[in-house]
Regions:
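A short, hydrophobic C-terminal helix/tail in secreted or cell-surface proteins
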Residues: 228-232
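Conserved short alpha-helical segments that host acidic/polar catalytic motifs at enzyme active sites
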Residues: 1-197, 201-227
């Protein structure tokens, strides 16, 4: 954290440890051959089979995570691909499970590839750059304009340009949505920590919840949706 890094393209990530213990070796991003870097939300369910195949190709594994197979798969695919996005489009077809991915390659240093399946991913459209996150809350300090990727989308994100392809490889135009959420709603503000903020904001949260449900000094709550949900299940 204390080391300053120069550059205009980068990825970083924090997540729960779904495979392996929390450790430096299991931390993201995962790197293959000092060429491909990957951050990943989700679970690759067939990672054991992929890992065994990659070991036969000479790949060595440094972590216990499922994410490392993604980096190696892309590194191998790049050898027969003209672009990074083409490589990603090829390899994601072999992944079973869910993923929200941010991918970089030293061979294509001006871009990040983002793709999702069963895991949310949002692109932030800024005036001085573009961003990737699993939730718009993480980007509110940078921009209020967002593109929400759809299932199977693969996006090429550059400093001043975003190009998106759908699951079938067709070039698509996803809408840019302006968020109404204020940055102050997701930071600590003047509080020492988030728990303190949550405690002191409870009255306002209750007020906001009940405001549209009070009629003639009585609280009206509709259980129609809950009943419908119970019936469906």
């Amino acid at each position: 954290r204390s080391n300053k890094i120069k550059g205009n393209v980068g990825i970083a990530h924090t997540r729960w440890a779904t495979h392996g213990e929390p450790s430096n070796l299991n931390a993201h991003p995962h790197i293959s051959k000092n060429s491909v870097s990957v951050v990943h939300n989700g679970i690759i369910e067939n990672y054991v089979a992929l890992k065994n195949d990659q070991k036969k190709l000479g790949y060595e594994f440094k972590s216990e995570t499922d994410t490392e197979v993604i980096a190696h798969a892309i590194d191998y695919s790049i050898k027969s691909s003209k672009t990074l996005i083409e490589s990603v489009q090829k390899v994601v077809k072999s992944f079973e499970g869910s993923y929200g991915l941010g991918i970089m390659s030293s061979k294509f240093p001006d871009q990040i590839i983002a793709t999702r399946k069963g895991s949310p991913l949002v692109l932030g459209v800024g005036s001085n750059g573009n961003y990737i996150a699993s939730d718009q809350m993480a980007l509110l300090s940078k921009t209020k304009k967002f593109i929400f990727l759809e299932e199977g989308d693969v996006a090429e994100v550059k400093l001043d340009k975003i190009t998106i392809f759908d699951l079938d490889g067709n070039l698509v135009d996803r809408p840019v949505i302006k968020s109404k959420i204020k940055a102050g709603q997701v930071d600590k503000g003047n509080y020492d920590h988030f728990m303190q903020k949550e405690i002191f904001e409870q009255p306002q949260a209750i007020r906001d919840t009940l405001e549209s449900r009070i009629t003639n000094n009585s609280v009206t709550v509709s259980y129609t949706h809950l009943r419908a949900h119970e019936t469906d299940s």
